[in-house]
């Protein structure tokens, strides 16, 4: 994955220079994982779960199949904290 400033993209994860937006992947399998290598910028989850004002380094985005369209970040460093990220 190429990283240019704070722009990065993997699968259904897309960013612009100011915010990382996690698209709704509720149509995907509940165990579909997306690895984030590095995103240098604020993250905002459009489903309202796992909001962060800091960079994400590492970590995995999972689709919580029991809650349609709700995504979480697990592991990695989210807003300076290791692990977690889902309210």
From Swiss-Prot:
Protein name stated in the entry: Putative uncharacterized protein DDB_G0271896
Organism: Dictyostelium discoideum
InterPro entries the UniProt entry points to: HssA/B-related
């Amino acid at each position: 994955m190429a990283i240019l400033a704070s722009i990065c993209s993997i699968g259904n994860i897309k960013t612009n220079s100011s915010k990382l937006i996690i698209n709704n992947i509720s149509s995907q399998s509940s165990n579909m994982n997306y690895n984030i290598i590095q995103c240098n910028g604020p993250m905002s989850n459009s489903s309202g779960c796992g909001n962060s004002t800091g960079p994400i380094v590492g970590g995995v985005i999972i689709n919580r199949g029991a809650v349609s369209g709700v995504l979480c970040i697990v592991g990695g460093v989210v807003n300076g904290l290791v692990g977690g990220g889902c309210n």
